[in-house]
């Protein structure tokens, strides 16, 4: 089994920078990392992040309209298409390189691309007709934003959801105490340094989104912890 380690995070933060040659962007952009993200995730996390992403996949089988925000290279997207042959999916992703990676993944897996609409847009500026999606997915994405940005983003996404929508999210977390907390803090410090340098990430630290989801009318139905509590998968349901 692969375990996150501060050493692996530090190597990612410092050793990988020299390999990425594109100029920096003044605003948050993952363009410089798109071609490298797959191997970076594999080295850093093995299959753990994908296990987090797909923990509650079975709950998506009856959904019809899905909103995937910050989907990246499409690892969750292909699994969603496999388990739900009728779902229509909107993927909002700011990075053109990530969209290209996701489209190539769909082609390799020979999945029905006609059921997927890619929209290249900053999530903070994206808008949708209210009440359209019965599934919202934010995997390893909300950790990119500061508290005041989440306060704007989450209600905006919730507005696009139906009254019976479910919200799946996977992300990192900081355990409450002990060596697990210190370990998570060391890893996250390295990760935020790396992504701030490489992507102009706006956030400097992790903001739990729970209170914003609750204020938007969602209730935590289930949470699974991974890797000594450093990662989690959540199932949120709208209370109606």
Protein language model annotation of sequence segments:
Residues 2-35:
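N-terminal, positively charged/glycine-rich alpha-helical extensions of SAM-dependent methyltransferases
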Residues 24, 170-216, 223-224:
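C-terminal alpha-helical "lid/dimerization" subdomain adjacent to the S-adenosyl-L-methionine
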Residues 46-63:
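Conserved alpha-helix/loop element of class I SAM-dependent methyltransferases that forms part
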Residues 67-125:
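Class I SAM-dependent methyltransferase SAM/SAH-binding core
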Residues 126-136:
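A short acidic, Gly/Pro-enriched loop at the edge of an enzyme's catalytic core
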Residues 135-149:
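A short SAM/SAH-binding and catalytic strip from SAM-dependent methyltransferases
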Residues 151-163:
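A short glycine-rich, Lys/Arg-flanked "PGG" loop and its adjoining helix->strand segment in the class I
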Residues 216-219, 224-240:
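Core SAM-dependent methyltransferase catalytic element
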């Amino acid at each position: 089994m692969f375990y996150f380690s501060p050493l692996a995070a530090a190597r990612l933060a410092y050793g990988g920078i020299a390999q990425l040659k594109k100029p920096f962007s003044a605003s948050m952009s993952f363009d410089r990392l798109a071609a490298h993200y797959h191997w970076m995730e594999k080295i850093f996390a093995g299959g753990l992040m994908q296990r987090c992403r797909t923990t509650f996949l079975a709950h998506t089988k009856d959904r019809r309209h899905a909103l995937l925000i910050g989907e990246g290279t499409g690892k969750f997207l292909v699994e969603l298409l496999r388990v739900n042959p009728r779902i229509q999916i909107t993927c909002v992703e700011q990075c053109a390189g990530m969209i290209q990676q996701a489209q190539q993944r769909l082609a390799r897996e020979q999945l029905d691309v006609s059921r997927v609409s890619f929209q290249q847009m900053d999530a903070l500026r994206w808008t949708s007709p209210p009440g359209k999606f019965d599934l919202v997915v934010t995997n390893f994405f909300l950790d990119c934003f500061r508290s005041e940005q989440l306060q704007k983003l989450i209600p905006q996404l919730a507005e696009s959801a139906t009254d019976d929508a479910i919200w799946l999210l996977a992300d990192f977390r900081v355990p409450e105490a002990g060596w697990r907390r210190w370990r998570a803090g060391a890893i996250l410090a390295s990760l935020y340094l790396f992504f701030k340098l490489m992507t102009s990430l706006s956030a400097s630290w992790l903001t739990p989104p729970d209170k914003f989801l609750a204020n938007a009318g969602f209730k935590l139905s289930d949470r699974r912890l991974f890797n000594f509590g450093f990662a989690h998968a959540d199932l949120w349901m709208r209370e109606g």
